[in-house]
Amino acid sequence: MASFKLMSSSNSDLSRRNSSSASSSPSIRSSHHLRPNPHADHSRISFAYGGGVNDYTFASDSKPFEMAIDVDRSIGDRNSVNNGKSVDDVWKEIVSGEQKTIMMKEEEPEDIMTLEDFLAKAEMDEGASDEIDVKIPTERLNNDGSYTFDFPMQRHSSFQMVEGSMGGGVTRGKRGRVMMEAMDKAAAQRQKRMIKNRESAARSRERKQAYQVELETLAAKLEEENEQLLKEIEESTKERYKKLMEVLIPVDEKPRPPSRPLSRSHSLEW
């Protein structure tokens, strides 16, 4: 049985309620002031639950009124659990439960990797793909007194790291593979274009050299033909002169008479 009682009260009731001691029931006695004005009247709600009484105070007008509300409520399991336990016991159980949860969190293995850790590690691996991690091997003392060195594993390439991390990040692995394939295709196309340019340049050089050799050969041939023609012309001229000398009749040339001297045929004297 839970009962609610609303009645007007003064500040003296509040002081008397605060000075009273807590009962042995598991219910908690508390007071709450909604308006701390000392001149205003206050109303009080008494809440009876499980054998205890809880009082709540709030501000109201000066008209006194009383209101009782009786509510029947089943409290079987709750009373059976809370019976025999005080507030300190409940608080100790809460604190011990929090400590247990903290200890359970601390006992979790540290090798668990979250998604943020994996993405950060993958970005670091991609940024340092071209760098070689050179570290001094650490010394370790064995039980027999001898020393051994632990050599760290080297990262070979970012592509291997991306392929090895497919289990934790499938999207990043696919993206890295697509980027590597695009880079490989671009490099292959660039290499093919370079090879084609070199082959075309070599073919043009060969054509130029062949044309130059052909021109030189033609010039030499023309020079030889010119010399041969000049020789033939000279020989033909000599043969013709020889034939003319054989065919012509020899003629004796008579000497010409001397020319008459000029004289004056008429002369006049003045």
UniProtKB/Swiss-Prot annotation:
GO terms for biological process: positive regulation of DNA-templated transcription. GO terms for cellular component: nucleus. Residues 215-229 are annotated as: Leucine-zipper. Residues 1-46, 250-270 are annotated as: Disordered. GO terms for molecular function: DNA binding; DNA-binding transcription factor activity; sequence-specific DNA binding; transcription cis-regulatory region binding. It is found in: Nucleus. Residues 190-208 are annotated as: Basic motif. The keyword Lipid biosynthesis does not apply. Residues 187-250 form the bZIP domain. The keyword Membrane does not apply. Keywords: DNA-binding, Nucleus, Phosphoprotein, Transcription, Transcription regulation. Residues 8-29, 261-270 have a biased composition (Low complexity). The modification Phosphoserine is found at residue 27. It holds the Pfam family bZIP_1. Binds to the G-box motif (5'-CCACGTGG-3') of the rbcS-1A gene promoter. G-box and G-box-like motifs are cis-acting elements defined in promoters of certain plant genes which are regulated by such diverse stimuli as light-induction or hormone control. DNA-binding heterodimer with GBF2 and GBF3; non DNA-binding homodimer. Belongs to the bZIP family. This is G-box-binding factor 4. It comes from Arabidopsis thaliana (Mouse-ear cress). The gene is GBF4.
